[in-house]
């Protein structure tokens, strides 16, 4: 009997001492948008436990009492059989200090614990990008609270930084790079193999060459356009010149026709001129003219004299030649009568 009493005394003393130790506050981390269980440290539910109370500040959020229905402030809370408090779908408003108190069946408080709940946003998958011109690699994460970035090359840890962006200038590319983003509620990682040429062209040189090529194409197109326009203008000018020449030639061809018609008119009016020439041996004699004597014919066949020198002015007679007067031969000496040639 005495041993049983001593055992009960030591059990109560140990429970009360544990409750005193649990008064020290602890920190619990929760992920935004996810659920969490607030565990009672160093506690195990037994038949001697009569009541478990969870309070946030001075507000009761959940209560377990033996032989009674559990009390829950809202559907976001749930008290489990082991006394833990479950919070569903955490929001930033759920952060704060939660106090848990445990009572025994005889009404003695055997445990009192304060838990500080902090809500963190989970990290997103990091991104790796690099620039070959300056041999720089950058690791970046877009989402997450209290993020720490860790960079590895192969199995070698290169550096760590507590921020969302980290840059590193490499010296070799013998192994792939791995970027790891972590916080107290999540972690994500990404690995990339960096490929760069041995000697990369500077960015300004690439931009300059591209701009020069565009200018060359522009001026080439402008030159071709000007040449085509000039050829078209020359072709139009040549066409106009050909039209002018053709109109002039047609005008010249039409000009002599009236003269030819005028010349043909007298010919048609003079039937004698239009007749066929007489046969050889037949001499056409004009009426009223007689053949000249032989002496006069010989005169006509004599060579003509040279024209007078240039100093003297020669008056040329216009129109047809005038008829010459008849020359009668002198009568022979001794004959008193003048003999006339017989009429034809």
From Swiss-Prot:
Composition skew (Basic residues), residue ranges: 296-307
Keyword Electron transport: no
Domain Ig-like C2-type: 122-202
Alphabetized UniProt keyword annotations: Cell adhesion, Cell membrane, Disulfide bond, Glycoprotein, Immunoglobulin domain, Membrane, Repeat, Signal, Transmembrane, Transmembrane helix
Stretch list, region Disordered: 237-344
All copies of domain Ig-like V-type, residue ranges: 23-121
Major localization class: membrane
Transmembrane intervals: 203-228
Residue intervals on the Cytoplasmic side: 229-344
Subunit structure: Interacts with CD48. Interacts with CD58 (LFA-3). Interacts with CD2AP. Interacts with PSTPIP1. Interacts with FCGR3A; this interaction modulates NK cell activation and cytotoxicity.
Function: CD2 interacts with lymphocyte function-associated antigen CD58 (LFA-3) and CD48/BCM1 to mediate adhesion between T-cells and other cell types. CD2 is implicated in the triggering of T-cells, the cytoplasmic domain is implicated in the signaling function.
Entry's Gene Ontology BP terms: cell-cell adhesion; heterotypic cell-cell adhesion; immune response; natural killer cell activation; natural killer cell mediated cytotoxicity; positive regulation of interleukin-8 production; positive regulation of tumor necrosis factor production; positive regulation of type II interferon production
Annotated Pfam families: C2-set, V-set
GO MF term list: identical protein binding; protein kinase binding; receptor tyrosine kinase binding; signaling receptor binding
Bias (Polar residues) ranges: 259-273
Highest taxon above the source species: Eukaryota
Positions annotated with a glycan in the UniProt record: 99, 106, 134
Signal peptide: 1-22
Region CD58 binding region 1, residue ranges: 56-68
S-S bridge residues: 132-196, 139-179
Extent of Pro residues compositional bias: 320-332
Residue intervals annotated with topology Extracellular: 23-202
Membrane topology label: Single-pass type I membrane protein
Organism: Rattus norvegicus
Localization in the cell: Cell membrane
Protein name: T-cell surface antigen CD2
């Amino acid at each position: 009997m005495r041993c049983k009493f001593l055992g009960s005394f030591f059990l109560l003393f140990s429970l009360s001492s544990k409750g005193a130790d649990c008064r020290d506050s602890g920190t619990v981390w929760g992920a935004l948008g996810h659920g969490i269980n607030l565990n009672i440290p160093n506690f195990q539910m037994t038949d001697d436990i009569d009541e478990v109370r969870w309070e946030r500040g001075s507000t009761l959020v959940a209560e377990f009492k033996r032989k009674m229905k559990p009390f829950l402030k809202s559907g976001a809370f749930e008290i489990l059989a082991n006394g833990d408090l479950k919070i569903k779908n955490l929001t930033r408003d759920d952060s704060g200090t939660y106090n848990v108190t445990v009572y025994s069946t005889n009404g003695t408080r055997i445990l009192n614990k304060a838990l500080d709940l902090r809500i963190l946003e989970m990290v997103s998958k990091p991104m790796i990008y690099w620039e070959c011109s300056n041999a720089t690699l950058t690791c970046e994460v877009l989402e997450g609270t209290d993020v720490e970035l860790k960079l590895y090359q192969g199995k070698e840890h290169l550096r760590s930084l507590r921020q969302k962006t980290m840059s590193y200038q490499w010296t070799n590319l013998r192994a792939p790079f791995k970027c790891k983003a972590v916080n107290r509620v999540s972690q994500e990682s990404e690995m990339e193999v960096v490929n760069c040429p041995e000697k990369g062209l500077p960015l300004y040189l690439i931009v300059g060459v591209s701009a020069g090529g565009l200018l060359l194409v522009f001026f080439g197109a402008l030159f071709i356009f000007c040449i085509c326009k000039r050829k078209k203008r020359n072709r139009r000018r040549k066409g106009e010149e050909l039209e002018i020449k053709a109109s002039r030639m047609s005008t010249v061809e039409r000009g002599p026709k009236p003269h030819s018609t005028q010349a043909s008119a007298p010919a048609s009016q003079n039937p004698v001129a239009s007749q066929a020439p007489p046969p050889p041996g037949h001499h056409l004699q004009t009426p009223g003219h007689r053949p000249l004597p032989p002496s006069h014919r010989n005169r006509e066949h004599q060579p003509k004299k040279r024209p007078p020198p240039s100093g003297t002015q020669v008056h040329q007679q216009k129109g047809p030649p005038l008829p010459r007067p008849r020359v009668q031969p002198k009568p022979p000496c001794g004959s008193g009568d003048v003999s006339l040639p017989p009429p034809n």
